[in-house]
Amino acid sequence: LFDKDPSLELFMQYSKNPFRKFNKRELFGIGARFNIKENLKAGVGLMNEKEEDLLAVTDNTLRITSYVHNEFIIEENIIFDLSVFLQPGIDSFSDYKATLIGQFDFHINDSFKISLQYNTFYDSRPPSNAVKKEEGFATVFSYNFN
């Protein structure tokens, strides 16, 4: 079923975003990654999330975290990446976060890449005054010095 044995993942995140109506978000997690096919990966794990809104109200949530990531090679220098994340709370599955990220990568040469990204984020119980769903577009220019 899998190309390789599952691998262990450890991850952490610290972010601040007053535009999304939260002061900070901290998370730490552990999980397993499965290589289903060469370009298809999935993961599942547990994470502890701590959020603080702009009024300094904090919320700690233990969540299941899961994702699927697929990479589609369109041309030799054009790749489409698709990632989907689902993170329900362990105490209440109706408290969940879901994220979808789609990205075209245009490799100009071995060092330079232009990426066009679309993302959407849904939080069933967002911090006070925040919206439940957000969407965004981004253009990213990357240069690899190696």
Task: Label the predicted regions.
Residues 2-49:
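Gram-negative (and chloroplast) outer-membrane scaffold detector with strong preference
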Residues 42-77:
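Histidine/lysine/aspartate-rich catalytic loop segments that bind and position anionic ligands
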Residues 24-28, 58-64, 94-98, 133-137:
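Residues that define the transmembrane beta-barrel architecture of outer-membrane proteins
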Residues 12-18, 46-52, 86-90, 120-124, ...:
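Transmembrane beta-strands of outer-membrane beta-barrel pores
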Residues 2-8, 38-42, 72-80, 106-116:
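Repeated loop/turn-to-beta-strand initiation elements of outer-membrane beta-barrel proteins
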Residues 10-12, 30, 42-44, 66, ...:
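Membrane-embedded beta-strand positions of outer-membrane beta-barrel proteins
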Residues 1, 14, 34-36, 40, ...:
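Residue-level signature of outer-membrane beta-barrel architecture
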